[in-house]
Amino acid sequence: MEIVGCRAEDNSCPFRPPAMLFHGISGGHIQGIMEEMERRSKTEARLAKGAQLNGRDAGMPPLSPEKPALCAGCGGKISDRYYLLAVDKQWHLRCLKCCECKLALESELTCFAKDGSIYCKEDYYRRFSVQRCARCHLGISASEMVMRARDSVYHLSCFTCSTCNKTLTTGDHFGMKDSLVYCRAHFETLLQGEYPPQLSYTELAAKSGGLALPYFNGTGTVQKGRPRKRKSPALGVDIVNYNSGCNENEADHLDRDQQPYPPSQKTKRMRTSFKHHQLRTMKSYFAINHNPDAKDLKQLAQKTGLTKRVLQVWFQNARAKFRRNLLRQENGGVDKADGTSLPAPPSADSGALTPPGTATTLTDLTNPTITVVTSVTSNMDSHESGSPSQTTLTNLF
């Protein structure tokens, strides 16, 4: 877009200064100013004519009185001294506007043409940009920095958690569901809300056709080829599954899936082994409270060295197995899976009752000489056992 020179005539430029009102200037000075302006206009006309003869003004065709140019905007004749040349057409200064926002483009450095219409830079990228932000659905210019997640592209300011609007940067862990981005904390909350604790991993996979809610990391894209082993099993956990039975002489394992793969590929599972003192602590507290709150989980995490997430899932699966064992006990008292008899519920006179005011505190859970109170059902009495290794809670798993 260029501002093209004045109209060319044979001898002089037709420009004449309009009548002006001068204050405080004598008549002689006014006459001198008028003569100087006329002299300059004649000089400009001679230079323009010489440039045209030398072929240096091929891109700026002058307007001649014989064949006046027509404005591409309004269709009228261009009689102004200056006009605009854009997309090989002549325009009045006032007629070159964006067709969307009506912004005058005479002072802009660039303008865009599409299907015969003129656009400013912002409207052109908004309407015809190749890529759009998956959050605000506005165009992304080629010079902007973006964040990529799966097949979606986001502005840096739009790559935030859909729940808390926390800005996610490179290296942060996040999750995606239905093209929405979540930070790690709210993604875990979303997982817990969608999948009830009593459902196991196999039931979830059978219902949903495979888990489709993996964690992502801002430093990379979707993994291709052979999966990598994770250094820390606590990172990138999708669903944690409690495996087999609890035994003090054998270590328990939590199965952790990596990113989901098609059924034709084999999935590798990361296993976390519990140490004996960790198992004793968790079992002892489970005998007191089947559903610990956040404060109790924090204390257990400090005592066992496990994360709150691992402890949550262990208690969820322990509660589910405890309920299954109670159902089997009501149906006959025999566990058909392992062929062992479950202990009968204690009667009202089956031992000394533990006073309610002497509940075992969390700091005493690893003491081998403590008294463990086992709660079988809500309407049954508690009884006293000798030590954690002989408690009836162990047989329930």
UniProtKB/Swiss-Prot annotation:
Pfam families: Homeodomain, LIM
Keywords: DNA-binding, Homeobox, LIM domain, Metal-binding, Nucleus, Repeat, Zinc
GO molecular function, one term: sequence-specific double-stranded DNA binding
DNA-binding interval(s): 267-326
Compartments it resides in: Nucleus
Disulfide bonds listed in the record: none
Residue ranges occupied by any LIM zinc-binding domain in the UniProt entry: 69-130, 131-193
Keyword Nuclease: no
Biased composition (Low complexity): 353-364
GO process terms (BP): cell population proliferation; dorsal spinal cord interneuron anterior axon guidance; female gonad development; gonad morphogenesis; male gonad development; negative regulation of DNA-templated transcription; neuron differentiation; regulation of transcription by RNA polymerase II
Entry-linked InterPro entries: HD (IPR001356), Homeobox_CS (IPR017970), Homeodomain-like_sf (IPR009057), LIM_Homeobox_TF (IPR050453), Znf_LIM (IPR001781)
PANTHER family in the record: LIM/HOMEOBOX PROTEIN LHX, LIM_HOMEOBOX PROTEIN LHX9
Record's protein name: LIM/homeobox protein Lhx9
